[in-house]
From Swiss-Prot:
Organism, scientific name: Caenorhabditis briggsae
Assembly and interaction partners: Interacts with the flavoprotein subunit within the SDH catalytic dimer.
Main location: mitochondrion
Cross-referenced PANTHER family: PROTEIN EMI5 HOMOLOG, MITOCHONDRIAL, SUCCINATE DEHYDROGENASE ASSEMBLY FACTOR 2, MITOCHONDRIAL
Family recorded in the similarity comment: Belongs to the SDHAF2 family.
Gene3D superfamilies: Flavinator of succinate dehydrogenase
Coiled coil: none
Cell compartments where the protein resides: Mitochondrion matrix
Keyword Chaperone recorded: yes
Function as written in the Swiss-Prot or TrEMBL entry: Plays an essential role in the assembly of succinate dehydrogenase (SDH), an enzyme complex (also referred to as respiratory complex II) that is a component of both the tricarboxylic acid (TCA) cycle and the mitochondrial electron transport chain, and which couples the oxidation of succinate to fumarate with the reduction of ubiquinone (coenzyme Q) to ubiquinol. Required for flavinylation (covalent attachment of FAD) of the flavoprotein subunit of the SDH catalytic dimer.
The entry's keywords: Chaperone, Mitochondrion
Protein name, per record: Succinate dehydrogenase assembly factor 2, mitochondrial
One of the GO BP terms on file: mitochondrial respiratory chain complex II assembly
């Protein structure tokens, strides 16, 4: 039985390791263009449609203009310790973000972008 599960486990771990490398907050030695491309992809493929739209639209309009430190902060924001729904709730004023998030200049840019795109309710 263990010989049968060995290859399956190895394949699963390999897929997990690949997925983890695609979503971690920093990739050592990553070129700036590659970082922008990765962040654009990760902004559009969040796992929940709401964040796909909010972060994907922000990324399309802003990543090319962002400096390396801003890209690093954006990477940490979207791929860091915050759950997807929490990030959505912070951006949609449903929850107050933690102090470190609220003070982050990149979060403030994303928040401003989201607030400006918000459709007024009647």
């Amino acid at each position: 039985m263990t010989t049968l599960l060995g290859p399956i486990t190895r394949r699963f771990l390999s897929a997990t390791q690949i997925a983890r490398s695609l979503t971690r907050a920093e990739v050592p030695g990553e070129q700036l263009d590659a970082k922008r491309a990765r962040l654009l992809y990760q902004s559009k493929k969040r796992g929940i449609l709401e964040n796909d739209i909010l972060l994907g639209n922000f990324a399309e309009e802003n990543l090319k203009k962002m400096s390396e430190p801003e890209l690093k902060a954006y990477d940490k924001l979207i791929n860091g310790e915050h759950m997807e729904w929490d990030l959505f709730y912070y951006l949609s004023n449903k929850k107050t973000p933690p102090e470190d998030v609220e003070k982050c200049s990149v979060y403030q840019k994303v928040k401003k972008f989201v607030d400006e795109k918000r459709v007024p309710r009647s």
